[in-house]
Amino acid sequence: MKLIIQIPCLNEEKTLPLVVKDIPKKIDGIDKVEILVVDDGSTDRTSEVAEELGVDHIVQLSYNRGLAYAFMVGLDTALKFGANIIVNTDGDNQYNGCDIPKLIKPILENKAEIVVG
């Protein structure tokens, strides 16, 4: 079971390291956790920071297309890379990465196909 955590970003070079650091590297029931950053036309070093952090996948949009577009690109890309489960989190460190195992638990237990939280 592969989990890809997608992070749509716009000028998040300062907060992205906090977000990536907070994401659990191992989760019970998940064989592989990967991180995907979708850089929505940032004018700062968001993509470079993502690369320095060693995230698994980076998609750079040539200009700001908006959060909804970046989100959809992230979903399509995560599926292309074989994600069984996709979690979206924000690049501004708004959500706690430690909540990801609780978020996906109903999916792993076959109690839900989608979870929003």
Provide a role label for each language-model segment:
Residues 1-117:
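Structured catalytic core of nucleotide-sugar glycosyltransferases
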